[in-house]
Amino acid sequence: MNAPTLGIIGGGQLGSLLADAAKKIDVQTVILSDDPDAPGKHFATKFIFGQYDDDTTINNFINAVDLVTYEFENIPFTILKKINEKKKVLPKPEINKLIQDRETEKKFLNENNIATTKYVTVKNKKDLSKNADLLPGLLKTTTLGYDGKGQYKFCLLYTSDAADE
């Protein structure tokens, strides 16, 4: 029996490490990346460059693999769902959708009695002022942040007469 061909969406550091580890157990890998020079290109059995929302690219990827995983969460849910209709995607697309939004993810964890660090949702300057006692802290975007991107160390709160933003 042949080992399955693993499709990996994303060709960055994690995709590269996964493809390299797969080689050691004779698993073929196909990396799909929107970066033509992604590092994973050098580790995968096959490399497909294209946009994640391009039907031809996605179909070529689906036809080249047996199952799919991804190295980062910022892949549109609709794309993962479409791929999952033809090839199994793990973690499930619904899990990815949950973790794409930090606020939704934290609420889910807390509702399921899983401890998280203390957090508050800040939508404007007024929300920040109400929680000034929590400073210093990190101000994070709720979506599209990764590896420190979308995160800002916040130590002091300056007040002004400016309108609430």
For each predicted feature, which ranges?
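Short glycine-enriched loop/turn motifs at secondary-structure junctions
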Residues: 41-42, 90-91, 113-115, 143-148
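Glycine-/Pro-rich loop/turn segments that contact NAD(P) or position catalytic residues
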Residues: 97-136
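Short acidic-hydrophobic, aromatic-tinged amphipathic segments that line or gate anion-handling sites
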Residues: 47-51, 120-123, 154
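Short active-site oxyanion
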Residues: 64-68, 116-118, 150
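ATP-binding N-terminal substructure of ATP-dependent carboxylate-amine bond-forming enzymes
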Residues: 1-100, 104
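ATP-grasp fold ATP-binding core
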Residues: 109, 133-154
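Conserved small/polar residues in nucleotide/adenosyl-binding loops
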Residues: 158-164
